[in-house]
Amino acid sequence: MGACEHCKTCPCKIYQGYKQPLEVPDHRDIMIIGDSVTPLETMHNTHMTGTAIKLLFQAMEQVGLPTSEDKVYLANAVMCAVPKKKGKAFPKEPLIECRGRLLKEIQKVKPKIILTLGKASYQGLTGDFNVKITAKYGAIEHFDYCGDAIVIPVMHPALIMRAPNDYKVFLTELHLVKQLYGGSGSNDTGITEWQILKTEQECLQAVEFLKQFPRVAADLETTSLDYREAEFCVLGICFQKNKVFVLPREMQHMAKKFFALDNLRWTWHHGKYDRKVMWRRGLTDYNVEGEHIFPHQNDTIYMHYVLDETSAHDLGYLTKTFLQAEEYKYKMNQEFKNVTHDTYEQYFDALCERVAVDADYTFQLEEALEKEMNKPGNESLVKVYNMVIMPAARFLAQVEQNGMLVDPTILEEMGIKYKKLLADIQSEIEEAAAPYWDKERYMQETGAKSASDKFKPSSPKQMSWMIFDRLKLKPRRRKGRSTDADVLKSIDEDIPLVKLVLQHRGVNKEYSTYVKGILKKRDIDGRVRSNFSLHITATGRLSSKEPNVQNIPASKGVGNVRRCFVPPKGKILMEVDYSGAELRWMAFLSGDKNLKEIFIQGRNLHKETAKKLFGPDFTPAQKMRAKAINFGIPYGREAKSIADEFAISIEEAEKMMADWYGAYPDCKKYLDWCAEQAVLGNYLQTPWGNRRRPGLVTPDTIAGLQNEFKNFPIQCSSSHTLLYTLIQELDYDEDLRRNIRMFEYLKKKWDVAVVDLIHDSVLLEVPMDKETVTAVSRYVSEKMIETPVKLFNCEVPFKTDTDLGPDWGNVQAFNNETGMMELENEHHEVTEVPYEEWIESVYHYDNYNQPWYVDAVSFQQHPEPFVRDISGEPGC
């Protein structure tokens, strides 16, 4: 039945349909099903003519699939022009009514392969309106009503136009289609075989057996993604393709025997998590430095990151991309939703299969990724992987284990203040809304069955009614009836209610993130352990989450959240910070002589910029503007943002930016050149060897991509400078039987622990005696300063500052040359105070007698609570 004939009999008759029937051909190899046609397509009797289908054909040609009309038939789930509303689900009715017509087209076309583009087309084909489509992408499915056709759901290319980083994932899905279309099937990954080691004797025999192999790949299955709750289920160790030993829970204590094998190179996929779980459960031995032994020489997640920083790095994606393996996780995950300590036996067979396949695929992936990395032209990638990325991954695992000690009483006090502040703002909101809030009218106009007597800003429905229906406001940014922060901030009218709602949301977010969030993540030894990631940002900058300890505000809301982070008794917190690291890298990379001269002569950059922009008699406020320009321009900050921050006109902000470019002309040339590479499709490379590739460039993303390209070289170089400094190899250590790394040396010589990395600074726990504090500050500063010179012969000098504090919220400047504290008051006047006098006045000795600290120390001395005793449990 043609589209026109179907539309005439369709009871839906809501949307514009075709006036002339479309021809449905006989026999095409590939049938592509979109969601619905557009009004323009119905008028011109065409379909699938937009930019999204052009992108689809471009991708199909790239992987070697046909796109000609004699091979490919383009169809739609719905043959009328259904309006697509952002944030709204595609309506069910037309999909249901049009399904019969679609199935008849399939019977006539008799395709070998059917591609469904996005969610609506899959729903139209299958009638499944509860599908989680992202779990289906790349899956191979068969349905009786599709005959012999293979059905493969893929991303809608229109989504990729808005999120071009997904283009490579999309290509991977099409690579699978190409293999099936060409009859080659999946790559020969083989059939995984595994042996379960059920006794200690079998484990010891396996250990002896592994002494003949050079490498293994391993994977750990647990009961939770939260390392604090995760319990060991099974450990898989792959020693040959398709050959895996599986260590069950009952033999978990034998893992140490395998980890002690020094002939093996161990490869994991994101092994940092596995390491943390094994440590948390007491399943590793310790070396002479007190660090636990967890062999982690290679990691496929980081190998892929240096090859492609913009794509996904999960094991499922990588196995499809590099091994052409069929997707398996979307099937297996269904069995793992309820794996707990008590359901271990129920899911044991599935756990063994999962861990064996993951270890086997990791083993095969390592080989495939090594081939990619060793291709001609990739020498810089090998260099940065071996010199920075892998050593940094192991180092960050240690930083995570160190954790940051948290005083919960500080957060509890702040929580009380936050609750009061939120209640006060809520009262102001109710008062401001009272003249407009009409409960009965709201229920009548919205169809709500009930409503509160007072306006509730936390109700999305009440908020949208108040903004759009009652106050009839017209935000410059509109997302349907959304009242998110971007929408409310774009309201030009001066409405007190809107400002109060924004304030309430901001304060509530602070309370949830920085008070409740940190308390929730606090471990039983009193510390929070963030998750640092090297592979999340395309710019190469380190990121942190759960909690984000790089983004703890110095002062926010009701007080300084950083005050809750404290050192253990007898130690002090030391923060050593690069001064203007990114701008110094900018001077070096751009070669701008004016900027280089300022740093070489040791002049204050912000004062010098203020002179160039405002003359020699600049004010403190103008110096702050100069500082904002200095840091903002490399990040692509625009004139409007500067104007809004300082309450000046856009014209003034534009003149300031133009004057900055005039003062540092080679910086402008360099930034423009970086932005141009994104448009030209070229990659950028840092002196360290990292690359930033543009990927798919679309009109929607080009501006943001150009800003990323401007910032990438300086941001990545700055981040790696700090990381490398801390992981660099020093002299040979007799105890370790290898060269000791700097963070290990700090621990061994001074008992110093690295507890946080904040972009360009490092936070340390240091013994509080003056001699140690001075020595550590000098040593760390010296090493940080020398790195750019030693590695890159950088003529721009780098500078560091040291701050000390009894907690992270009260750090003050320390001069490691004089041994004096340099205390600055609110008028920016500096007073020198002897360190000994200062430490006596600020150190919180009473804190270490409080119950929370006594409990933490008690746990550290007797860490049994970390390890769950499962002796006598079923299956043991």
Predicted feature descriptions by range:
Residues 238-267, 404:
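Nucleic-acid-processing active sites and adjacent nucleic-acid-binding tracks
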Residues 155, 285-308, 314-316, 602-607:
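Conserved beta-strand -> loop -> alpha-helix junction used to position metal-binding or nucleic-acid-contacting
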Residues 344, 394-401, 422, 450, ...:
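Conserved catalytic core of nucleic-acid polymerases
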Residues 227-249, 575, 582-617, 695-699:
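Metal-dependent catalytic core segments for phosphate chemistry
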Residues 1-184:
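A polyanion-binding, active-site-adjacent surface
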Residues 112-118, 217, 263-274, 575:
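Acidic beta-strand-to-loop metal/phosphate-binding motif
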Residues 420, 424-427, 431, 435, ...:
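C-terminal polymerase-core module
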Residues 179, 183-247, 284-295, 310, ...:
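Conserved "right-hand" nucleotidyltransferase catalytic core of DNA-directed polymerases
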